[in-house]
Amino acid sequence: RDVERSRGLGDVYKRQDSHIHTMFSSDSEENPVNVVNNAISLGFKHICFTDHNDFDAPLEDGKVMFDLDFPEYIKYFQNLKESYKNKINIHIGVEQGLMRSVADRVNAYDSAKQLDFIIGSSHLVYGEDPYYPEFWEKRSAKDTVLTYYESILDNLGCCHNFDVYGHLDYIARYIPANSYTYNWHDFNDLICIILKTIIEQGKGIEVNTAGLKYGMPEPNPCLDIVKMYHDLGGEIITVGSDAHEVKFFAYRFDVVADMLKNAGFNYYTIFNERKPEFIRL
């Protein structure tokens, strides 16, 4: 693996946040300019915006959610990229919701190849949203988590137009209190198959630090899953805050370098024009 040499361990915090949301996402009001200026002030060299696009997301109060205005999005960020080209490298990405029912649209997305990066994520489980309490009422919490992981494997069989799978154990953020104490070992075999499939498809995973602000003890996915991914031969691994407000940009990136090293990595990944670049820790 060819790995770009950087100036030291601390540089991992100053390279790129690869998962950021702005006013182009239905659940954020953040102005991208605020994020860019903050990144520059912190010494970041790269930044990648990844606003939501979730086909067939459930309506909220009668409004369509997470339907990205792609032409306007590209136009805006291409202009922003040009404006800041001498200060920071702005990459344009999307966080794409994956489901079998929308696979054709996912696979045809960005046919003109204007994006640098696509995160594929499971926000919905066969069309249902684990964010809402009623999602958890149909079966036991443990069985619901199993269904979530089964849906990821199903998504991998039909959705191919993405670069890394986002926040792999995302479901753990929303398990109702006093229902089931999440333990990834309960799903070890299935997670192993998921990771092997991701690797076989030449894709990667992300370390998403947003879980820490939800009170979780580790980023998503946890260290053990990241280590399993490495031990199975996984190479592509990005780092993202999943920030929806500028104050969470690069949130808790201080824990990431040690986490990746403990998992066996000596680098992490950024994407440019859908191609991975490897940055030494």
Language-model features: where?
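Conserved residues at the C-terminal ends of beta-strands
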Residues: 50, 121, 168, 208, ...
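Charged catalytic cores and adjacent phosphate/nucleic-acid-binding surfaces used
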Residues: 11-22, 32, 126, 178-281
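An N-terminally biased module of ancient metal coordination in phosphate/nucleic-acid-related enzymes
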Residues: 11-103, 109-112, 174-185, 209, ...
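Structural preference for beta-strand elements that scaffold enzyme active sites
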Residues: 15-17, 46-48, 89-93, 116-119, ...
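Short loop/turn motifs at secondary-structure junctions
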Residues: 8, 43, 114, 160-161, ...
